Amino acid sequence: MQKCGVLEKDDKIILQSKSILSECDLCDNCLGRFFVSSTNLSSGRRLGNKIRNSINFRIATKCYICKNLFSNIDLYVKMMQNMSTEYEFSTFTVGAILKQSIIERDDKLRSRFHLRGVDGIKTDVTKELGKKFIRKTKKRIDHLLPDVTFTINFKTEQCNVKTKPVFLYGRYVKDKRGLPQKEESCRDCMGKGCIFCNNHGIVSFDGVEGKISKFLYEKFKTERVKFTWIGGEDKTSLVMGNGRPFFAKLLSPKKRNVRLAKKSNLNEIMIHDLRKIDHIPNGSIQFKSKTKMLVSTKNNLSSNKLKKLKQLTDTPIEITDSNKQYKKRIYKLKYK
């Protein structure tokens, strides 16, 4: 029997391969996967081919484990390529949904021949998809925080794409009264996104949330925006000065590399200082706001009485709004 290359000194691989192939037919991918971790090769398919040539076993007509799934891998890579053209991304990862019968046959065979420390077939399938997609697109794989996640469903022969959220920080100025900060959620889905609201979660775009959301939909080709507001105001209030800060989480964005202007006029509100951030801060966000009040009195107030307002500095106060209580503190007070 002629041995070749990496197999010359490993009779154990040869003997185990003979035992396995005498019981069931395997493709080169499934055969090589059982032993590739104990060699210096990176390709299970290549190792499987070497083993088969070494022991003169015929090529399997139908693989016992995968039922020739690997012969169709290129079709799914092409599917990934076609779907990826809609998205801007640098990194990706890929997952797979296999028929349970395939996984069970793989587990059974690995247990039967005591094959320890061997990748399962699902891992091998995703590795093969990833390697081929990298060669086609030159994108980088990232298992922790990929821009795009592909999931290949081999049961339904479909490919699903999910993108990492984009996080933004910005400020808005509102120079017209009558605009609410928040929009009402879609009544059909309660803000989760459905066909009736085009997956936006809201159906009106007349307030601050709606106007900024619509702007971000167009810029990032995103479906839905979740806001974290730094404080709030009612529809009769103005937001002046540097504006009110906010955070936005963009769900399922197709665009990521968007150039953002320093200022954007959205008709009745202005947003500025808009920029990408890594994540939205956790927990309660501390902030200070400046409020201007116009007070009218029946009687004239002397300057001595007005000076007593200074006593409110550093005094905690409670505000009740919509049956919710908020604790505030007056840091500075001016009057004229």
Give each language-model segment a name.
Residues 1-336:
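RNA pseudouridine synthases
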